[in-house]
């Protein structure tokens, strides 16, 4: 993958997250802000999830209350470099824990 392909895939990922949050109809208030390739989700309880691009590695990194995760793109999805877990599965799990209600990304 070259840098251009990486940016296109990372942009698609961020857009999908934005669209999910814009359409979220739960009780929790989840705000997001994107600045310089870094997306920060802020929850009512003050906790945050940070998603950022690591261009030199062609990875997307996810930082949650539970820990940090690095994701590589393969076979049409972003997968954790340690556990093999898919990005949206891990993000949904973390957002649900931090929001106190089900938040589902796909």
UniProtKB/Swiss-Prot annotation:
This is Iron-sulfur cluster assembly protein CyaY. PROSITE patterns: FRATAXIN_1, FRATAXIN_2. The keyword Metal-binding applies. Signal peptide: none annotated. It comes from the Bacteria. The gene is cyaY. HAMAP family: CyaY. Gene3D superfamilies: Frataxin/CyaY (3.30.920.10). Belongs to the frataxin family. It comes from Yersinia enterocolitica serotype O:8 / biotype 1B (strain NCTC 13174 / 8081). InterPro entries: CyaY, Frataxin/CyaY, Frataxin/CyaY_sf, Frataxin_CS.
């Amino acid at each position: 993958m070259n840098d251009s392909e990486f940016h296109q895939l990372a942009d698609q990922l961020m857009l999908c997250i934005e669209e999910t949050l814009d359409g979220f109809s739960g009780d929790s208030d989840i705000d997001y802000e994107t600045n310089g390739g870094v997306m920060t989700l802020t929850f009512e309880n003050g906790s945050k999830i940070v998603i950022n691009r690591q261009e030199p590695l062609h990875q997307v990194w996810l930082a949650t209350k539970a820990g940090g995760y690095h994701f590589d793109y393969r076979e049409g999805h972003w997968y954790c470099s340690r556990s093999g877990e898919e990005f949206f599965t891990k993000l949904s799990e973390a957002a649900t824990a931090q929001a106190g209600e089900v938040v589902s990304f796909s």
